[in-house]
UniProtKB/Swiss-Prot annotation:
Pfam families named among the record's database cross-references: Phage_portal (PF04860)
Keywords: Capsid protein, Viral capsid assembly, Viral contractile tail ejection system, Viral genome ejection through host cell envelope, Viral genome packaging, Viral penetration into host cytoplasm, Viral release from host cell, Virion, Virus entry into host cell
InterPro entries in alphabetical order: PBSX_Proteobac (IPR030935), Phage/GTA_portal (IPR006944), Phage_portal_PBSX (IPR006430)
Role description: Forms the portal vertex of the capsid. This portal plays critical roles in head assembly, genome packaging, neck/tail attachment, and genome ejection. The portal protein multimerizes as a single ring-shaped homododecamer arranged around a central channel. Binds to the terminase subunits to form the packaging machine.
Family: Belongs to the phage portal family. PBSX subfamily.
Name of the featured protein: Probable portal protein
């Protein structure tokens, strides 16, 4: 782009024409929207839409280390004291817990024998389970998250035990209890991606190549511009040789826009956003695998574990057991039970 010569008539100052070119790398694709949008209705499948995008919730653990680790740790803690039984295997109980914590609800399909009696339960992925207006359910099954082909299974309300975490804004679906920390998890991920690009691109944010040398020909200018443009990509930008015959020592300057190595807030963003994620999950830092930065450490993990068990693990276990055991088709042999945790020294 060329700027025309302009004259300030009041001061008689001539503003010289400027040849300016800008070069930038392609932008990172924005993270999926994870706002709470409330309940919608899908006319195509005749079902309600969850308040938070389920596909985005499914991808979120892969974007943030703290969030993904805490989800699995919470699922392990809740399912650890499950005694097992005919209704659910221990692996299925863990799948139940992970779905419930990650998505805020989980559906259990009743498997019946030839007489119509319930003989076991199977947890369905909350990613694909949808609720109908009449109380029934659709399971929009896919082989993988990115598969366009899908099969739709429809179930009556009596065939599904639906466990959900209470949401005061709607009572159709549950809602994950960490919603307030989603943006912090995304910010933490964005900071990491930015730093990766920073190092991959030669550890610089960018620069201005400033030339005032009259001996710089248009051919040389085009060649320099081409070289800079071709330097985009991982590790490609290193150095450039420019020879201007009879040029001036200060005729060509590189002016850095900024050096994120010393000026950015990467460490602060990572630390604060990680704390937000822990707070959203109400998960003790002493159990999260965080390396303490002070001499005092993070306290006694055994004490944290005991308190966390009584305040967070047991209430979730009670919700699971109560919802399953109160179903009239669940007989004594299929009832769910968690053993008491003994923290005695």
């Amino acid at each position: 782009m060329k700027t025309n010569v302009k004259t300030d008539n009041k001061k008689g100052i001539v503003i010289a024409p400027i040849n300016d070119r800008t070069f930038s790398l392609s932008e990172i694709t924005a993270s999926p929207a994870l706002d709470y949008v409330g309940i919608g209705f899908d006319e195509n499948y005749n079902c309600y839409l969850p308040p938070v995008n389920r596909h985005a919730l499914a991808k979120l653990p892969h974007q943030n280390a703290q969030h993904g680790g805490i989800l699995h740790s919470r699922a392990n803690m809740v399912s650890a004291t499950y005694e097992g039984g005919k209704a659910l295997s221990k692996m299925e109980m863990r799948a139940l817990c992970l779905n419930l914590i990650q998505f805020g609800d989980v559906g259990l399909l009743k498997v019946r024998n030839g007489f119509g009696q319930v003989v076991r339960l199977v947890p369905l992925s909350s990613l694909y389970l949808r609720v109908h207006k009449d109380g029934g359910y659709s399971y929009l099954m896919k082989k993988s998250l990115y598969d366009t082909a899908q099969e739709i299974y429809r179930y009556d309300a009596k065939d599904i035990i639906f466990i959900k975490l209470y949401d005061p804004m709607q009572q159709v679906y549950g809602s994950p209890d960490y919603v307030g920390g989603i943006q912090s998890a995304l910010l933490n991920s964005d900071a990491t991606v930015f730093r990766r690009r920073y190092f991959s691109n030669g550890a610089h944010m960018g620069f201005i190549l400033y030339s005032t040398d009259p001996d710089l020909t248009e051919e040389m200018e085009e060649e320099i511009a081409r070289k800079i443009s071709e330097s985009k990509g991982v590790g490609n930008f290193r150095s450039m040789f420019v020879n201007i015959a009879g040029g001036h020592p200060d005729g060509l300057k590189v002016i850095p826009i900024g050096d994120t190595g010393t000026k950015d807030e990467f460490a602060n963003i990572k630390n604060i956003s990680a704390q937000d994620v822990l707070t959203a999950h109400r998960f003790p830092a002493g159990l999260s695998g965080i390396i303490p930065t002070n001499t005092g450490g993070l306290g006694d993990p055994l004490k944290y574990r005991e308190v966390y068990h009584y305040d967070e693990v047991m209430p979730l276990q009670e919700i699971i057991a109560e919802t399953i055991n109160q179903d009239p088709e669940i007989k004594n042999l299929l009832k769910i039970k968690f053993r008491e945790q003994n923290f005695a020294k």
